[in-house]
UniProtKB/Swiss-Prot annotation:
One of its GO terms (molecular function) is DNA binding. NCBIfam families: topA_bact (TIGR01051). This is DNA topoisomerase 1. It comes from Streptomyces coelicolor (strain ATCC BAA-471 / A3(2) / M145). Keywords: DNA-binding, Isomerase, Magnesium, Metal-binding, Topoisomerase. Residues 885-906 have a biased composition (Basic residues). Residues 847-952 are annotated as: Disordered. It holds the Pfam family Toprim_C_rpt. Residues 907-930, 937-952 have a biased composition (Low complexity).
Length: 952
């Protein structure tokens, strides 16, 4: 029976969803007897501070928002910004005869539905309405087939929320006292931060190895074509039967893993190349194997985040935001899922499109099934796919921008999942010969031809490694047979150096967390966002770089809260929480063991001590945070660099120091905030210490009482005010300190307080023209200028900023605007130096709206970006995305020659010992010196939020 005919008998139904966008879409599918309203997310939560806790609660309950002495009873309060919405829902409920709770079908959605029921206290029938796609048929089916609330899911979500509150509110204050105020710890965020820090430690300990090899271009002697090339390129594989070392044959200290491998240095490689000049080569073997590649499974949350990062340059958060919009507007199924399963309807829709778009030859006789799911999956139960029983092609959707790109990605992946395998042949050709000195050499070439593209016709998965070959890439070799003679047209001597392990990107960090079974797919985007916001990591291009602050935090947690950041322990916690969700374990006993350490197996054992699967491996958090006297704050935040220099993380950021504070030979210098820990060498530290102190206190602003200091910053010397401790640094109430660059005629050692106050008073209002449009004098990266509306004019000197009169300004505007460089508009915002191009990045106003540019690459701001809010990191990310999409640069083909040599990169010095926060390699000295001249505008403390707790 349809919803419309049901309500025709009388009655009014209230349907509550999370978001207004979702409400708007669903409303169009239901009849006039339905009222669809949004809760606008969670309406109730644990209190964010003691001020929100009802007065009847005192002591620990007031601090934590959880009564740990009475079965961990949570104290819920209606969010201040949701009170008016709750009143609206209650008013609508009074006029309704039935309530449908239509929140998302996952654990979080079930909790929202339960909180709505608890707060609204309906006296009418209540039904739980679930669906995983917003289509007319799906919504009507959900109305016709409601269910009861799943209390197990509700309990599981509540347990997670309480656990995260206890973890955050008990451990975070330790960080405030021992490292820096306003930091945070979290069940998953701290482990994710540790992963990034450990990868940087590996890079710090890494020693590069130089190795050489030979590459030969061999000709068959016959004319070739596209299907049968006339030559092939092969790499030297063995010399006298010993395999020639490649990068994978060296360990992280630059040593060969096996003595049986031949390590060629430059001299030996060149000598061998010379000995091969007149060698006669022949094909020794041709091995052909069938090639088959099956389609990739449809997307789940994490694979969508990873692929959107690789192919579209989206961060995890951006991917989920775009996917949320697509879901709410009825284009895709629910985007938080661990499943790769497709419904029968979806399989039929995908197979129909395969036949329609690619033909019956691309359709397998039987539907493909993808039953594999992540362990303990508790999210929605179908893969992410286009919605409906007939998939709209991307062109049919009318979508634009990021929504179009992500929909197209999902659509292609889904359709491809129901196509035939790609098939072909892979071939390996071995080419041998004898050098003039008698040594036997063997070169090897591999090829691949695809005879039937199958699913590759529709979709090819990206790769995290930029050097990895994609599945649809063919390498055709000449048709040769064993014994065929070949001529060496060119023997190239190639030098290489092993590289440190790559830093995590958002995509690879998500993959790592999932493989370790830490956290849940629905939380990964927010976790990465949190560690970026807290200043624990920052981005260089797409790489996630740990800050020195994160080294201090992880150092403390590892030494004093080892269990809490142990990977296996965290995964077992996740497993226990899922057992609670399935009803196989009880919440309160588990929380009691976690917090108080009750139960067997908790007598101080390490995180690796496995329990019986019922939480017995948990220790007592309360006891861990009670005795803090043993934690030496200075020790956990100090890291040796070398030459008696230490890197320390202070309340206002990292610095290097030699000697004790009160000693006569004491030296101290700030470390640039954007310096990667693996770039801090002894040489760079010495250079920093040799420079004058970075901060010059000029005095106090009489108007505000704030201290005014001069600094040598990343973009040159500047003055700024020091805001009082406790001033909000993030969020809508954030306060930014006044800052201004020094004039070219000024220097750090001569600038005065009066100079600083004048500089920080800019821009100066000069006056208004006859039409009342304000004219201001401003100082920018490209010099002083006047601004009137969107019309800007350059000034000749910096002094004019304070001296120019209204009459003089009007006279300048009365002149025709100059063309060429002088006519260029000043930037809307200056972001800093791009880590890739090393050029200044600015925001400009273009014909099609604001865009970021470094002078070489332009990238338009997206719909959810604004000139006022865009950060330097976001600007660099947009440019990196644009570069990734651009055409690859073509290099001119070199003339054929007999012997050529490519110089290996300079080998790192391996003599100097490196420690957790220092790296002394000659190869990095130059880069480190360059970086030393820069410092970011934001410190780690500025990035930290005032929130005590964190989700996960």
């Amino acid at each position: 029976m349809s919803p419309t005919s049901e309500t025709a008998k009388g009655g009014r139904r209230l349907v509550i969803v999370e978001s207004p966008a979702k409400a708007k879409t669903i409303k169009g599918y239901l009849g006039p007897g339905y009222v669809v309203e949004a809760s606008v997310g969670h309406i109730r939560d644990l209190p964010s501070g003691a001020a929100e806790v009802p007065e009847k609660y005192t002591g620990e309950v007031r601090r934590l928002g959880v009564d740990v002495e009475h079965d961990f009873q949570p104290i819920y309060v209606v969010n201040a910004d949701k009170k008016s919405q709750v009143k609206k829902l209650k008013d609508l409920l009074k006029e309704s005869d039935e309530l449908f709770l239509a929140t998302d079908e996952d654990r979080e959605g079930e909790a929202i539905a339960w909180h709505l029921q608890e707060v609204l206290k309906p006296k009418i029938p209540v039904k739980r309405m679930v669906f995983h796609e917003i289509t007319k048929d799906a919504i009507r089916a959900a109305v016709a087939n409601p269910r009861e609330l799943n209390q197990k899911l509700v309990d599981a979500q509540e347990t997670r929320r309480i656990l995260d509150r206890l973890y955050g509110y008990e451990v975070s204050p330790v960080l405030w006292k021992k490292v820096m105020p306003r930091l945070s710890a979290g069940r998953v965020q701290s482990v994710a931060t540790r992963l990034v820090v450990e990868r940087e430690r590996e890079r710090i300990a890494f020693r590069s190895a130089e190795y050489w090899d030979l590459t030969g271009t061999f000709a068959t002697g016959r004319a070739g074509d596209a299907s049968d090339p006339s030559s092939l390129v092969a790499r030297l594989q063995t010399v006298d039967g010993r395999r020639v070392a490649q990068g994978r044959d060296f360990d992280s200290l630059g040593q060969l893993k096996s003595a049986n491998t031949l390590h060629l240095d430059e001299a030996n490689a060149r000598a061998l190349a010379a000995a091969l000049e007149n060698t006669r080569f022949a094909v020794r073997s041709v091995e052909s194997k069938p090639y088959r590649r099956s389609p990739y499974a449809p997307f789940r949350t994490t694979t969508l985040q990873q692929e959107a990062s690789r192919k579209l340059g989206f961060g995890a958060k951006s991917t989920m935001q775009v996917a949320q919009k697509l879901y709410e507007n009825g284009y895709i199924t629910y985007m938080r899922t661990d499943s790769t399963t497709l419904s029968d309807t979806a399989v039929s829709a995908a197979r129909a499109q395969v036949t329609q778009l690619y033909g019956a030859d691309y359709l397998p006789p039987q539907p493909r099934t993808y039953a594999g799911k992540v362990k303990n999956a508790q999210e929605a139960h179908e893969a992410i796919r286009p919605s409906g029983d007939r998939f709209r092609t991307p062109a049919e959707t009318g979508l634009t921008g990021d929504q179009f790109k992500l929909y197209e990605l999902i659509w292609k992946r889904t359709v491809a999942s129901q196509m035939k395998d790609a098939t072909g042949n892979s071939v390996t050709v071995k080419i041998g010969g004898a050098a003039s000195d008698g040594r036997d050499v063997e070169f090897s070439a591999s090829g691949k031809t695809i005879t039937f593209h199958g699913f590759l016709k529709a979709y090819v998965e990206g790769a995290d490694d930029p050097n990895a070959e994609l599945d649809d890439r063919e390498r055709r070799l000449p048709q040769v047979a064993e014994g065929d003679a070949l001529t060496a047209e060119e023997i190239t001597v190639d030098g290489h150096a092993t590289k440190p392990p790559a830093r995590y990107t958002e995509a690879s960090l998500v993959k790592e967390l999932e493989e370790r079974e830490i956290g849940r797919p629905s939380t990964y985007a927010s976790i990465i966002g949190t560690i970026l916001d807290r200043g624990y990591v920052f981005k260089k291009g797409t790489a996630l770089v740990p800050s020195f602050l994160s080294f201090a935090v992880v150092n403390l947690l590892e030494k004093h809260f080892g269990r809490l950041v142990d990977y296996d322990f965290t995964a077992r916690m996740e497993d226990d929480l899922d057992r609670i969700a399935r009803g196989e374990a009880q919440s309160v006993p588990w929380l009691r063991r976690f917090y108080f350490g009750e139960g067997d197996g908790t007598g101080g054992g390490g995180a690796a001590d496995a329990g019986n699967g019922d939480g017995d491996h948990l220790g007592g958090l309360k006891e861990l945070v009670t005795d803090l006297g043993a934690i030496d704050a200075r020790e956990v935040s100090s890291f040796p660099v070398g030459n008696d220099i230490k890197l320390r993380v202070g309340r206002y950021g990292p610095y290097v120091e030699r000697g004790e504070k009160d000693a006569e030979n004491h030296q101290r210098a700030d470390v640039p905030e954007d310096l990667a820990p693996d770039e801090l060498s002894v040489e760079l530290a010495e250079e920093l210490l040799a420079k004058p102190s970075g901060d010059f206190e000029l005095g106090t602003d009489p108007a505000t009482g704030h201290a005014i200091v001069a600094k040598d910053g990343r973009y040159g010397p500047y003055v700024t005010e020091v805001l009082p401790e406790g001033t909000p640094k993030t969020g809508k109430n954030a306060v930014k300190p006044r800052t201004a660059s020094l004039f070219k005629s000024m220097s750090l050692d001569t600038v005065t307080l009066d100079d600083a106050l004048k500089l920080m008073s800019l821009p100066r209002v000069v006056g208004a023209d006859a039409e009342g449009v304000e004219i201001t004098a401003q100082n920018g990266r490209y010099g002083p200028y006047l601004k009137k509306g969107t019309d800007s004019r350059s000034l000749q000197t910096e002094d004019q900023l304070f001296e120019i009169t209204l009459e003089e300004a009007l006279a300048i505007y009365a002149q025709p605007k100059q063309r060429g460089r002088a006519a260029a508009k000043p930037p809307l915002k200056e972001l800093g130096t791009d880590p890739v191009s090393e050029k200044p990045v600015v925001v400009k106003d273009g014909r099609f709206g604001p865009y970021v540019t470094d002078g070489e690459t332009n990238a338009t701001l997206r719909s959810d970006d604004s000139v006022e809010e865009i950060t330097p990191e976001r600007g660099y990310e947009l440019l990196a995305e644009k570069r990734a999409k651009g055409p690859a640069k073509k290099t001119a083909k070199k003339a054929v020659k007999k012997t050529a040599a490519k110089k290996a990169p300079a080998k790192k010095a391996a003599a100097t010992k490196k420690t957790a926060a220092a790296k002394t390699t000659a190869a990095k000295k130059t880069a480190a010196k360059s970086t030393a001249k820069k410092t970011t505008a934001k410190t780690a403390a500025k990035k930290a939020t005032a929130s005590k707790t964190s989700e996960d």
